Amino acid sequence: MNHPKIIIPTKVVVQNDAMHDTTSPGKLITETIPSDRIVDVVIPDELKAVLSEVKTIIWNGPMGNYENGFTEGTLELTKLIADTGAFSLIGGGDSVALIESLGLEQKFGFLSTGGGAMLEYLAQGTLPGIAVLESQE
């Protein structure tokens, strides 16, 4: 997917899906990710230059296989975004919990534990519950 305003990291660490071994370093991939692999850590190095120039950041969910202990990419991205000064909208319970655990809530413009709902609202301009309430006015 190529779009000047949507940035998808190109370097990731992947691991065999069957392993679920958080002690293995995995394998750095800079090409197509094989279908039998899962992303363990997204390396956001290439995002540093871009993030220093943007005015708004929308981020939903952790980077990679966060639930199984692979937190490096998510931690680094969190700190990068916190230091940009850009207005940021962050969605997803894991992302918000991490930001809160680091005490960085004040560095972000908007935090939502409902990441999918946040994205739906941004895309559609409303949510089903809001639409019902608005139609009853």
Task: Give the label of every model feature segment.
Residues 1-137:
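Active-site loop-to-helix "anion-binding N-cap" substructures in soluble metabolic enzymes
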